[in-house]
Structure formats: structure tokens, C-alpha cells
Amino acid sequence: MQQILLNNSEPILVEEIVRTVPQQRIVVRGIWGGQAVFAKVFYGARAKQHYLRDLSGVNYLAAASILTPPLLGQDESSVDGALAYVLIFAAIADAVNTEQLLATSSQQARFDLAAKLVKVVASHHQAGLLQTDLYPKNFLATTEHIYTIDGDGIRHYAKLDQKTALHNLSLLLSKFDVLDLEYWIEDLLTVYAQARDWKTFPHRTTVPRLVNTYRQKTASMYADKKVFRQCTDVNIQQYRHCFVAWASDFSSLPIPSETEQLDALVAKASLLKGGNTCTVALAKFGGADVVIKRYNIKNVTHRLSRMFRQTRASVSWANAYRLQFFGINTPKPIALIEQRDFCLRGKAYFLSEYVEAPDVASYFAQIEASATRDETVKEIVQLFYRLYLLKLSHGDMKFSNIKMLDARPMLIDLDSMQQHHCQYFALKAHAKDLRRFMRNWKDDTSLYNAFLQAFKVVYVDHSPLIKAKILSD
């Protein structure tokens, strides 16, 4: 068993490396002095600064009587021959990360947990504390309690003003599922006001706007920037004539980065879709089925028009991660490969996992029970409403671009998907998506009417249905 040797006490027996932030810190689960613990090891150029900031945050939480895992010890160690600082915390028995709970619990259980998190954040604010890294993963839940972890993000204010507190609350709310929050937000604002001993919640209309701003900003930072550079989720390789972004989860697959080799594979693979603009093929790598979507350059004029613009492959890459970020089903992205001469782009490839699943029309043709059909209709309509609330438009909602996997819809063909920032254009694009989707069922009156009824029930805001002319004023 691996050990972390400490300068002033017995070593930590490491059972699991929980998290690694290169050149900054390592978080491990293990045993220290016969007790189950979590330890943070700070190393690198700013090790002491990060260590002291985390320690300060933990002390602020403890002083305010806010539940946080007890700090059992502080010590020093060595990483790569350099001094490292160690904080050792008691492991909380049966505690689960609240991000995991929100992803796996029933709707009522999710609301109950969200309300508890809002109360905890209200207690932070009441004590003049602000968690700047406000993610559900920075809280642990047991049957009875919520624990705040990660002291590094805790800041103390002599007097925390209302505006700052509401921005921080909005940051937390932006991390909840957009469809859940659409139904919960009024109740959660009431929970917060009661926890702060406020008679009413001030600026009630401001918070939803802030939530949307934070949500879009966080998603864009991840999908439009982070996954195009070296990070935990993605490995980057840059060659003289090629740019490669590789999903860390698929780093073991023997996929070539040379475009000539990829073209040879596409030529031998099973063709799923041919055409001048793009070619889609199914290939096998190390036993895994992989979809290769190659965006072709048709001629010199087409090359000149594309070389300064973002490739459609990179749009698919970003949107796949965007949907994953929002918890929307889509095949996992594997790699993005672009021909590049300096900053000039050429042919590009988007690789994703192959998912064996019927499209939505085939799925409905297989369904016999009306209850199953109605539940499937509701799932698809909820997907559409979620996209509307997120200001995301797909651009081509034909039935073949919606697969059904384990009775849940999955979106494919993401190169026309757009993240809108203006409500006017978001509404216009969503109405277009709705019209295209409903045209799929123009010859099936029963299914068309089932979707229409579900849209009327699920959509709290009927304006996109009216705009799409599938519902009258």
C-alpha cells in the first residue's frame, strides 16, 4: 500500500487517490493513526499559500459552527524532493457527495437536498462567509446532515452585503438541473429568506436572470474553452500540420492522429453516411465501435471559406461536452482532429462512441403499451423544454437525430447546435426546432396529438409553442 510520509507523525496509508491538480495538490483517502481520513497534500510553487488559504477557510467554518469534516492534523511532507504541506481530515461515515445524489435521486429527494443546500449557504452568508467555488461537489450529505468541504474557496467578510450574497446564491442555483429549477425556484428562494430571517425575498426577479448568466458563463468556459486545452477531461497534442484533442476516458484507444491514416480507416470502415460535405463511418478500435465524422473540403473555394472559421468538427466537439455538462444524453466525444497550417484550418474529424439504439420513430413503432408511449413522449418533450430553458437550439430535429437509449432520448448530429445569448434569437431558433420535430409526425395523428398535449403540459411558458404555430394564442 502506498504511503505519504509525514515529517512529524506517522505516515498516511493511501487507499485511493481521489483527485489530482497538477503542480498544486493531491487529495487522498486513507488511514492515519488507525482512523479513516482524507488528506490534502499541497505542493508546487504556491503550496504554502494554498495550504494556508484552505486552513483559514476550515477555521472560519468551524468558528461559525458550520458543519465541516473535523481537522485532525497538519503536517509537512515531500513531493518530488520539495516541501509539501498536508491537512488531514476525518472521513465522514456514509457521506455521499451531493453532486452524485442530485444526479441519481428522485425528483422529491432532489428538491429536499436542494433545499438543505440552500439552507447551508444561507448559514454561510449569515456568518459572513462566501464559498467562491460553489459546486454541489463541495458538500457531503449523510442521512441527517450536510457538510461543507473545501476550505480553499471560503472567504470571510466583516459584513456581507445583500447583493454579494444573492449573487452567490444564484451561483449555487445555477448548478441545479435547469428543468428542476424551473419548478423549484420560488420555493427555494422562500427557504433562503426564512433561513436569513427575512420577511420577504428581495429582488425576486433578479435571481433567475443571474442564474441564467452564471449557467451560460460556466458552460461556455467549459465547452468553448476548457476542452480545447489540456485539462483533466482532455489531452491536447499539437503537431506542425495537425491539432488533436483527445478525451481522457478514451486515451487507451489506438486511434491514429495522422489524417492520412484516418482517411484510410474511413475508406475501409462501414459507411453510415456519404456526401461531399461530410462522410460518416463506423470503425473499430481496440474492440470499441467508434463513429468517425469527417468534414470534407469540397474545392478550393470551399477551403478558402472554411480556413479562418471554426470547423464543424470542433462545433460538434464543444456541443457534445456542453450537453454532457447540462446532463443531456449524447454519445461521448472521443477525439477532435483538425488539419492546421499555422492558424489556417482544413479537413477536420470528430470521433464519438457508437451507440446501438433505435431512432425515435423506430422506437415508437416497437412500443405496444400506451403507458410506455406516453412516458416516452413526456421524456422527449422535457428534453425540448430543457433545451429551451438553456437557450440551446439543435438546428435539425428530424427523427433520425434523436435516438432512444434505455427509454431516454439522446441527441446526435450536433454540428448545427447553437448556444444563444439573446432571448429573441433563442425563441426564434427553438420555434424552428419545434416545427421541424412536429413535421416528423404529420402522418401520425395520434402521436402528433400526444406530443401537442405533452408540450402544453410540460412548457410553463407557452410562447415558443405559439411562435412555432403548433399552439394558437
Show which residues each predicted segment covers.
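Catalytic-loop of the protein kinase fold
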Residues: 129-136, 392-399
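Conserved protein kinase catalytic/activation segment
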Residues: 138-149, 401-412
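Juxta-kinase regulatory segment immediately upstream of eukaryotic protein kinase catalytic domains
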Residues: 1-16, 206-268
